[in-house]
C-alpha cells in the first residue's frame, strides 16, 4: 500500500474522532444549537457555542456517524443546504457577538440529491464562501478526515486552514477524478497520487498553514496539541486590526 493509499484509507476510517468529539474534548461547556431558521435542522452539520480558555467561541463541524444507524441520521456526513445555512447562521451570530469561529471538516462532499439541489445546494455553498470571506471575526478551519470538494470549502474560507496528518483535502474524490479522467473509478489510488491531496503535499504548496501530527501520539495528546495551537493562533489573529485580518484572508485565497 502506498503512502497516499494509506492516508486515504485512514482519512475515511469510521473510527476517527468526529466533530462532536473534538467539540466536547477541546472546548469547555459546548452547547449545541440547531436549525437554519428556514427549512430544517441538518444533522450532518453540528454547531454551537463554547469556551476556549475562557474565550467564547463558535464551533461548527461536519459530523459523520460511527455506525450505520448514526451515519443514516448524519447523512454519512454529506450536508444538505439546510446544514450550510445553519452554519452560516451561527457564523453571523458569532460575528455579531465578536466570537472567533472554529470549524471541523470531514465530508466526502455536499449531498448531491435532487431535493438538495431543488432547495439551493449550490447557492448555499456559494453564499457561505462569500460571507466567510468577509466575516469580521477570526476563522480557523481544521480538516479532521475527508475534505471533499465545495462541500468542505464551504466551511474552510478561513484565516488559517489546518489538517491532521492522515487526512485529505481535494476538489473532488479520487474515485470521481478517476471516473472523469479514465472512465474507471477503480483507479482511485492512482488518481489520488496525481491530485496532491495529502497534508504534506498541500502544506508544501501553501494551501494549508499547519499539519497536526498523528502518528506516535495518543488521542489525548492530539487534542491538547490542537487546543494549544488554537489558543495561540486566535490570540494572534485577534491582535490584528479588522482591516488587516480581512485583507490577509482575501490575499490568502487570491494567491491560488
UniProtKB/Swiss-Prot annotation:
Which pairs of positions does the record mark as disulfide bonds?
Answer: none
Q: What class of enzyme is it?
A: transferase
Q: Which UniProt keywords apply?
A: ATP-binding, Cytoplasm, Fatty acid biosynthesis, Fatty acid metabolism, Lipid biosynthesis, Lipid metabolism, Nucleotide-binding, Transferase
Give a yes or no for keyword Lipid biosynthesis in this entry.
yes
Q: Name one GO biological process term.
A: fatty acid biosynthetic process
Domain (CoA carboxyltransferase C-terminal) spans 1-236
Name one matching Pfam family.
Answer: ACCA
Q: What stretch or stretches form a coiled coil here?
A: none
**Compartment(s) where it occurs, according to its Swiss-Prot or TrEMBL record:** Cytoplasm
Q: Which InterPro entries match?
A: Acetyl_CoA_COase_a_su, ClpP/crotonase-like_dom_sf, COA_CT_C
- Reactions the enzyme catalyzes: N(6)-carboxybiotinyl-L-lysyl-[protein] + acetyl-CoA = N(6)-biotinyl-L-lysyl-[protein] + malonyl-CoA
Entry-linked Gene3D superfamilies:
2-enoyl-CoA Hydratase, Chain A, domain 1 (3.90.226.10)
Q: Which domain of life is it from?
A: Bacteria
Query: Its annotated pathway?
Result: Lipid metabolism; malonyl-CoA biosynthesis; malonyl-CoA from acetyl-CoA: step 1/1
Tell me which EC number(s) this protein carries. Answer: 2.1.3.15
Q: Name one GO molecular function term.
A: acetyl-CoA carboxylase activity
What PANTHER family does UniProt report for this protein, alphabetically? ACETYL-COENZYME A CARBOXYLASE CARBOXYL TRANSFERASE SUBUNIT ALPHA, ACETYL-COENZYME A CARBOXYLASE CARBOXYL TRANSFERASE SUBUNIT ALPHA, CHLOROPLASTIC
Complexes and interactors:
Acetyl-CoA carboxylase is a heterohexamer composed of biotin carboxyl carrier protein (AccB), biotin carboxylase (AccC) and two subunits each of ACCase subunit alpha (AccA) and ACCase subunit beta (AccD).
Which NCBIfam families does the UniProt entry name for this protein? accA, AccA_sub, PRK05724.1, PRK12319.1
Role this protein plays: Component of the acetyl coenzyme A carboxylase (ACC) complex. First, biotin carboxylase catalyzes the carboxylation of biotin on its carrier protein (BCCP) and then the CO(2) group is transferred by the carboxyltransferase to acetyl-CoA to form malonyl-CoA.
Protein name according to UniProt: Acetyl-coenzyme A carboxylase carboxyl transferase subunit alpha
What species is this protein from? Streptococcus equi subsp. zooepidemicus (strain MGCS10565)
UniProt gene name: accA
Amino acid at each position: 500500500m502506498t503512502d497516499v493509499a494509506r492516508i486515504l484509507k485512514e482519512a475515511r476510517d469510521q473510527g476517527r474522532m468526529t466533530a462532536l468529539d473534538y467539540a466536547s474534548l477541546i472546548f469547555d461547556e459546548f452547547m449545541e444549537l440547531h436549525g437554519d431558521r428556514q427549512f430544517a435542522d441538518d444533522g450532518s452539520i453540528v454547531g454551537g457555542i463554547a469556551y476556549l480558555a475562557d474565550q467564547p467561541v463558535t464551533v461548527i463541524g461536519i459530523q459523520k456517524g460511527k455506525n450505520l444507524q448514526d451515519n443514516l441520521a448524519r447523512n454519512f456526513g454529506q450536508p444538505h443546504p439546510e446544514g450550510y445555512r445553519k452554519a452560516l447562521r451561527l457564523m453571523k451570530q458569532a460575528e455579531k457577538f465578536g466570537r472567533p469561529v472554529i470549524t471541523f471538516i470531514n465530508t466526502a462532499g455536499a449531498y448531491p440529491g435532487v431535493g438538495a439541489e431543488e432547495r439551493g445546494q449550490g447557492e448555499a455553498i456559494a453564499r457561505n464562501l462569500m460571507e466567510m470571506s468577509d466575516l469580521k471575526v477570526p476563522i480557523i478551519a481544521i480538516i479532521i478526515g475527508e475534505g471533499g470538494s465545495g462541500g468542505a470549502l464551504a466551511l474552510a474560507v478561513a484565516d488559517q486552514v489546518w489538517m491532521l496528518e492522515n487526512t485529505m483535502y481535494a476538489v473532488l474524490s479520487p474515485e470521481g477524478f478517476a471516473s472523469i479522467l479514465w472512465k474507471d473509478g477503480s483507479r482511485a489510488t492512482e488518481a489520488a497520487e496525481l491530485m496532491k491531496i495529502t497534508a504534506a503535499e498541500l502544506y508544501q504548496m501553501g494551501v494549508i498553514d499547519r499539519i497536526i501530527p498523528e502518528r506516535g501520539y495518543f488521542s489525548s495528546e492530539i487534542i491538547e496539541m490542537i487546543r494549544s495551537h488554537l489558543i495561540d493562533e486566535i490570540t494572534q489573529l485577534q491582535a490584528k486590526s479588522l482591516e488587516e485580518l480581512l485583507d490577509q484572508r482575501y490575499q490568502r485565497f487570491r494567491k491560488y
